[in-house]
């Protein structure tokens, strides 16, 4: 019997240890929160300070700016150029394939191979505007918008995860504090009992084995108290990390969490969950890329207008000299239109379409998996809520019975009607009942939090928390 109760308490402490052990990586200590924190304060601090949220918001804003970047493709392009050079004037007939190494030379063939050089200059301005693209730029803007929507959805999902983690860490600290209180009360009772047994043994009214057993029980209770305190301190560190104030001391106020709330769980609409909306936005982004590929195999029409001037120090036989060439001497202007069509891009475009088709299937499968996971989480949360409510209704009965049993066991021992073993077992049972009663109320709140997280909206949960 004693071993079974001890194992129950150890499992309780172990469960709390597992709860606070799962946390996110923090980016460094933040400013210590001022005053005791309520659960709402903890969530607000997490949404304000947690680095992961700041990162997501910045990336979402960057994705929004990408839409503006895509829109700039509608604007005309204006390029300026000025060039000054000194070079030889030797020229030949013949073709030169397009490349970027050998500089071209304009003018007649002079038949010279001299290394004499002259000055040359050039300047110009070119105005280009892609007037017709058959929807290619609009498709690029649609891609940017879809990616921006996905980034915003991911930000909302991150906010939900961070807020839920902060709330869970808050409840974990409260549960750990209740375990400490129960363990400390058990130590105090066992201390009083051990002193009483010591007096009885000194008066030779009880055997010395009773004193040894009482002191052993007291030592075990003190060890359990030390373990509970360790778990509490570590849980507080996890909470500080969850609210973006890693390393800062945090003090909590229980507020309405000390009572059992009314439970009314709404039906799940998985499509409205931020995780589902993010997956849907990812599907839309892939489909936007598909639509862009549908517009890729079309020509583009570009209007161009240029004005330029050149100067050269080279002399052509029979022609008047134009000067030293250090400055512009011969002007030119041009206006026209260019139609460009990438004929052989058909093969790469078709290959990319096949890639995006598979990406749509993959993103759709992930969306279906998310809906299935959310549905399962909702079923589990409902089962957890029902069990938590039933336990919260039963623990007061357990606590009162344990108190009566402990009081009667002590009275029987004082009158010599039972052994120290029965008293020790009754006191452990009372310690467990006290912890169960305190944790049962928090268990209902934790179940409501799990339900709200499964539904993707913490507002109903926070409304209950803020109720007077």
Give the positions of each predicted feature.
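Acidic, low-complexity, intrinsically disordered peripheral segments
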Residues: 2, 30-32, 86-88, 381, ...
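Amphipathic alpha-helical coiled-coil segments
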Residues: 55-70, 158, 162-181, 192, ...
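Periplasmic alpha-helical coiled-coil/stalk elements that build and connect Gram-negative outer-membrane
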Residues: 2, 158-272, 384, 388, ...
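Small/polar-residue-enriched beta-strand and adjacent coil segments characteristic
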Residues: 36-38, 77-157, 277-289, 296-370, ...
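C-terminal segment of classical bacterial N-terminal signal peptides
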Residues: 20-28
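Short, glycine-/polar-rich solvent-exposed loops and beta-turns at beta-strand/coil boundaries
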Residues: 72-75, 162, 207, 297
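Bacterial N-terminal signal peptides that target proteins for export
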Residues: 2-15, 20
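Bacterial Sec-pathway N-terminal export signals of envelope proteins
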Residues: 29-84, 89-92, 130-131, 247, ...
């Amino acid at each position: 019997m004693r071993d079974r109760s001890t194992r129950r308490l150890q499992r309780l402490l172990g469960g709390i240890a597992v709860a606070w052990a799962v946390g996110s990586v923090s980016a460094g200590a933040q400013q210590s929160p001022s005053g005791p924190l309520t659960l709402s304060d903890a969530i607000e601090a997490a949404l304000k300070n947690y680095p992961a949220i700041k990162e997501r918001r910045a990336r979402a804003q960057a994705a929004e700016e990408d839409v503006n970047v895509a829109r700039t493709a509608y604007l005309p392009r204006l390029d300026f150029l000025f060039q000054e050079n000194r070079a030889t004037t030797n020229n030949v007939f013949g073709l030169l394939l397009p490349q970027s190494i050998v500089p071209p030379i304009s003018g007649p063939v002079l038949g010279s191979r001299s290394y004499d050089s002259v000055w040359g200059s050039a300047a110009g301005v070119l105005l280009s505007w892609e007037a017709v693209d058959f929807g290619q730029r609009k498709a690029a803007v649609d891609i940017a918008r879809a990616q921006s929507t996905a980034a915003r959805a991911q930000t909302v999902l991150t906010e939900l995860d961070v807020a839920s983690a902060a709330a869970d860490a808050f409840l974990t600290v409260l549960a750990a504090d209740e375990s400490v209180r129960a363990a400390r009360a058990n130590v105090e009772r066992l201390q009083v009992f051990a002193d009483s047994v010591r007096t009885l043994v000194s008066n030779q009214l009880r055997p010395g084995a009773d004193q040894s057993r009482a002191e052993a029980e007291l030592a075990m209770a003190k060890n359990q108290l030390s373990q509970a305190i360790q778990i509490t301190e570590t849980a507080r560190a996890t909470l500080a990390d969850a609210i973006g104030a890693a390393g800062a001391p945090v003090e909590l106020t229980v507020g309405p969490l000390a009572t059992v709330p009314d439970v009314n769980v709404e039906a799940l609409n998985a499509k409205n969950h931020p995780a589902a909306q993010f997956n849907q936005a990812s599907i839309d982004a892939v489909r936007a890329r598909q639509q862009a590929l549908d517009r890729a195999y079309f020509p583009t029409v570009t209007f161009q207008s240029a004005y330029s001037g050149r100067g050269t120090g080279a002399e052509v036989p029979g022609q008047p000299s134009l000067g030293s060439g250090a400055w512009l001497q011969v002007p030119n202007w041009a206006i026209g239109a260019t139609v460009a069509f990438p004929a052989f891009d058909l093969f790469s475009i078709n290959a990319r379409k096949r890639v995006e088709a598979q990406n749509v299937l993959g993103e759709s499968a992930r969306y279906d998996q998310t809906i299935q996971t959310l549905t399962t989480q909702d079923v589990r949360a409902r089962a957890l809520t029902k069990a938590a409510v039933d336990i919260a209704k039963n623990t007061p009965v357990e606590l009162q019975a344990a108190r009566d049993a402990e009081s009667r066991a002590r009275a029987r021992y004082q009158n010599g009607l039972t052994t120290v073993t029965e008293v020790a077992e009754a006191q452990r049972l009372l310690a467990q009942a006290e912890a169960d009663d305190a944790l049962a109320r928090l268990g209902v709140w934790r179940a409501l939090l799990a339900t709200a997280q499964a539904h993707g909206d913490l507002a109903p949960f926070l409304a209950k928390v803020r109720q007077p």
